């Protein structure tokens, strides 16, 4: 009996389409729906009835139109040409779509994910007779200032019968052939819902440095860790993620705009090409991939966009690179899940979200990690997901589910954002589970007393927050001098250490040696001032000391001048309080 590969539309509910007669179809197969051949994916099967989520607008689709299955899962094409690219949620390049259909995305449009005409300079690193395994490296291709390693597809292994000589090839040309006849190209396909296999996951030991003092010092993230940035609207989630994308120490950045405003993606597209990559000196876009799935694009494609993004990140991880994946925002993704679930008439759980929300979020975040690849390379994917709880309610299901999965929680505060405090991360409401893991690295690479200094700063900020409540009730005059000193030191730490000026070329990003120097300066001021109070100096005399202004200017000092500036301030602190000690 021949299996029928084509069915018909039985009912339509927004992006959810039910098709009858889908014999031989499999879960997560890609289908073409209607005369316009809209792209969809089977998400439930019941006999010959398939439930399809359509990645394009279904307006005008009618009952009885054909539904044809391709027999393949939703896959992305992985190879040279992805860097500097901007795609929609299912890896269709937006510049090619614009050439084909103008400024608006036409329905049913088919464009190649990668440039099939461009020739790449391939240099083989294997030869005929060698045995290759999944994710093994066949050779390299230069892409901008980046060395793109050509990988064997993860499920392929065997002995090489032939390898193409060094030269120029397109992504469709055969560059190697196995003895069993399998042909290998510069690119290969991989299904987005399947994590790429690895040899083993590694214990994280290196920090993912963001250039933001509050994150790198107080709430660090490991290379290969997962962090959440929850916050109400307008608190700076997108700006924080864009800043991490600009200044983070990852080799590759994958930025997924999932259901956010189109203007925010435009900001990225306008800003990133103008930004200089501190590592290479070239444009930052040359190591960035953007996936733009704005709020007015079909809901179902949002659900796919985060999987597309993490699959691209895993591909570069398998080449031995560290990759940062920004998902902005996972709440919009969860809303897409909720809408599709309600269209399919599934039983809702809390706030209408499907019961499997936690499992889906975990499946996404668990694809982060530092790994040893099948070929023996060390790579990492660090995931930073924004969460947009309605009204800033941190008890809503998406925030709570994310909280259980991620290891760093960077809570944004609308009050800080209104006060123009950037980054608006609440130092009393955030935490990182990676701090004890990274203490050894900080001791060896930054300063032997770094963890103790961080702990003291955290303690001072907590004491200041408690005293501020007293000040609001009875005023500052009710406090003793040593308590007023804590409030003054806390203010200095907030304004001159945790706060950064994103528009200042020096202060927008800070290195760890500079952060360490600033920590020592502020804590030395507190220690010397506390001793001076005990020796008879008043708090007003300390507050009026000109050295405070020099401490405030320290963060604007360029890296190459900072050591000399810091030594000068430390000497001045010694001189200022020396007379009091005597």
From Swiss-Prot:
It holds the Pfam family ATP-synt_ab_N. It is an enzyme of class 7 (translocase). GO terms for molecular function: ATP binding; proton-transporting ATP synthase activity, rotational mechanism; proton-transporting ATPase activity, rotational mechanism. Produces ATP from ADP in the presence of a proton gradient across the membrane. The V-type alpha chain is a catalytic subunit. Its EC number is 7.1.2.2. This is V-type ATP synthase alpha chain. The keyword Lipid metabolism does not apply. It catalyses: ATP + H2O + 4 H(+)(in) = ADP + phosphate + 5 H(+)(out). The lineage of its organism: Bacteria, Thermotogati, Deinococcota, Deinococci, Deinococcales. ATP binds at residues 231-238. One of its GO terms (cellular component) is proton-transporting ATP synthase complex. InterPro entries: ATP-synt_VA_C, ATP-synth_a_Xtn, ATP_synth_asu-like_sf, ATPase_a/bsu_AS, ATPase_F1/V1/A1_a/bsu_N, ATPase_F1/V1/A1_a/bsu_N_sf, ATPase_F1/V1/A1_a/bsu_nucl-bd, ATPase_F1/V1_b/a_C. GO terms for biological process: proton motive force-driven plasma membrane ATP synthesis; proton transmembrane transport. It comes from Deinococcus radiodurans (strain ATCC 13939 / DSM 20539 / JCM 16871 / CCUG 27074 / LMG 4051 / NBRC 15346 / NCIMB 9279 / VKM B-1422 / R1). Keywords: ATP synthesis, ATP-binding, Hydrogen ion transport, Ion transport, Nucleotide-binding, Translocase, Transport.
């Amino acid at each position: 009996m021949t299996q029928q590969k084509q069915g018909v539309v039985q009912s339509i509910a927004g992006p959810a389409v039910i098709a009858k007669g889908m014999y031989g179809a499999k879960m997560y197969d890609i289908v073409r729906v209607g005369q316009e051949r809209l792209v969809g994916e089977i998400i439930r099967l019941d006999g010959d009835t398939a439930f399809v989520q359509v990645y394009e607008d279904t307006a005008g689709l009618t009952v009885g139109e054909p539904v044809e299955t391709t027999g393949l899962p939703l896959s992305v094409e992985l190879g040279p040409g992805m860097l500097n690219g901007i795609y929609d949620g299912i890896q269709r390049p937006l510049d090619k779509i614009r050439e084909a259909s103008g400024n608006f995305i036409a329905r049913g449009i088919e464009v190649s994910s990668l440039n099939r005409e461009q020739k790449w300079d391939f240099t083989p690193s294997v030869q005929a007779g060698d045995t290759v395994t999944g994710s093994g490296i066949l050779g390299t291709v230069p892409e901008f200032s980046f060395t793109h390693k050509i990988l064997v597809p993860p499920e392929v292994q065997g002995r090489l019968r032939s390898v193409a000589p060094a030269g120029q090839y397109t992504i469709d040309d055969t560059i190697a052939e196995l003895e069993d006849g399998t042909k290998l190209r510069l690119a290969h396909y991989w299904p987005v819902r399947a994590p790429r296999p690895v040899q083993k996951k590694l214990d994280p030991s290196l920090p993912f440095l963001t250039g933001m003092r509050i994150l790198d010092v107080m709430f660090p993230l490991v290379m290969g860790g997962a962090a959440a940035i929850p916050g109400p609207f307008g608190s700076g989630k997108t700006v924080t993620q864009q800043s991490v994308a600009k200044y983070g120490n990852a080799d590759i950045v994958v930025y997924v705009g999932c259901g956010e405003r189109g203007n925010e993606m435009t900001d990225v597209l306008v800003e990133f090409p103008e930004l200089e990559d501190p590592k290479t000196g070239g444009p930052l876009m040359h190591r960035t991939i953007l996936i733009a799935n704005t709020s007015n694009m079909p809901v179902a494609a949002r659900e796919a966009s985060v999987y597309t993004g993490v699959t691209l990140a895993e591909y570069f991880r398998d080449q031995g690179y560290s990759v940062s994946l920004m998902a902005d925002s996972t709440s919009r993704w969860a809303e897409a899940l909720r809408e599709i679930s309600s269209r399919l008439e599934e039983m809702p759980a809390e706030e209408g979200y499907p019961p499997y929300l936690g499992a889906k979020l975990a499946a996404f975040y668990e694809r982060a990690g530092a790994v040893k690849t099948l070929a023996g390379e060390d790579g990492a994917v660090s995931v930073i997901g924004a969460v947009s709880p309605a009204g800033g309610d941190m008890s809503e299901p998406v925030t709570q589910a994310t909280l259980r999965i991620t290891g760093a929680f960077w809570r944004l505060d609308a009050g800080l954002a209104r006060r123009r405090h950037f980054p608006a991360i609440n130092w009393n409401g955030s935490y990182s589970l990676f701090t004890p893991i990274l203490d050894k690295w900080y001791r060896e690479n930054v300063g032997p007393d770094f963890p103790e200094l961080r702990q003291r700063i955290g303690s001072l900020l907590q004491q200041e927050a408690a005293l501020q409540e007293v000040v609001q009730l009875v005023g500052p005059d009710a406090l003793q001098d040593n308590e007023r000193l804590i409030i003054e030191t806390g203010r200095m730490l907030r304004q001159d250490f945790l706060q950064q000026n994103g528009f200042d070329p020096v202060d927008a990003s800070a290195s760890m040696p500079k952060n360490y120097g600033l920590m020592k300066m502020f804590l030395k001021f507190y220690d010397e001032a506390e001793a001076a109070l005990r020796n008879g100096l008043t708090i007003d005399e300390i507050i009026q000391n000109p050295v405070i202004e020099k401490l405030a200017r320290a963060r604007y000092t360029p890296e190459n001048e900072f050591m000399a500036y810091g030594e000068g301030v430390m000497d001045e602190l010694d001189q200022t309080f020396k007379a009091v000690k005597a």
